[in-house]
Design a protein with these regions (language model features):
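Short, acidic/turn-prone active-site loops that include or flank metal/cofactor-
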Residues: 1-5, 55-56, 76-81, 129-132
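Class I S-adenosyl-L-methionine
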Residues: 1-50, 59-60
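Short, surface-exposed amphipathic charged segments that create phosphate/polyanion-binding patches used
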Residues: 9-15, 87-93, 137-146
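Short, hinge-like loop/turn segments at secondary-structure boundaries
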Residues: 13-15, 38-39, 65-70, 118-119, ...
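A contiguous loop/helix-start segment that scaffolds small-molecule binding in enzyme catalytic cores
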Residues: 18-19, 98, 102-209
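Short beta-strands and strand-loop turn motifs
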Residues: 21-25, 71, 75, 125-128
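General beta-strand structural signal in soluble alpha/beta enzymes
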Residues: 24, 51-54, 101, 126
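Class I SAM-dependent methyltransferase SAM-binding "motif I" and its flanking Rossmann-like core
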Residues: 37-95
């Protein structure tokens, strides 16, 4: 970041002839927190350094989630709005790996609403304030979580773990079904079977699109 570069430029190599410790007051440096610029500086200037494992919400939430998949993608914090946010959400919902991201309490309900519209039956795991006094977790479909979270206290920092997209047959997914050149009623039956939604609701959505 600009601030990291500015601080490093104000230092000389003599600074690093002493034992220097860089810590974060919450989370782990370099993981959605500053720190990577300092590590790169040390590498380029041949300054010996070490990294000690610390609190990591990603791995803790992964272990807590109960999902059996062994691979995941980490998306950090999403953009607040705009095309880039919508595009990233599509990437997440089409990812064949578990998706993990961070979200603030101010935008969590918005995220759940977006997910519930795009894929109401996708299973989501939410972890709040991991390792802290008010730690809590929830696991349900995106639609159920959105409805639940309208009425509860969502203060605190959140980790969101999203189940990979489901495929059927020869890696056939919902987008493949929607793109088939078949009657909407048949599409509706196939999608309803895959997602658990009612045929009537799916058919209506297909007509609207």
């Amino acid at each position: 970041s600009h601030n990291e570069d500015k601080i490093l430029k104000s230092l000389d190599k003599e600074t690093f002839s002493k034992n220097v410790v860089y810590v974060s007051d919450a989370g782990m440096p370099c993981v959605s927190d500053p720190g990577a610029t300092l590590v790169d500086y040390c590498i380029k200037n041949e300054i010996p350094y070490d990294v000690l494992p610390g609190a990591n919400a990603i791995l803790t939430a992964y272990a807590m989630s109960g999902f059996s998949t062994t691979t995941f993608s980490f998306y950090g914090f999403l953009d607040h709005k705009g095309v880039s946010r919508a595009s990233k959400l599509d990437d997440i919902l089409n990812d064949d790996k578990l998706s993990i991201l961070y979200e603030s309490p101010h935008r969590l309900l918005k995220l759940l609403e977006e997910l519930s519209i795009k894929d109401p039956n996708r299973t989501i795991f939410l972890a709040k304030e991991i390792t802290k006094l008010h730690q809590n977790s929830y696991k349900d479909t995106s639609l159920n979580l959105f409805n639940k979270f309208k009425d509860i206290n969502i203060k605190g920092e959140w980790v969101v773990v999203i189940k990979p997209k489901e495929t059927i047959g020869f890696n056939l997914d919902l987008n493949d079904i929607q793109n088939l050149d078949i009657a909407p009623k048949i599409k509706a039956k196939l999608i309803a079977k895959m997602t658990g939604q009612s045929i009537k609701d799916v058919y209506q959505k297909l007509l609207e699109n």
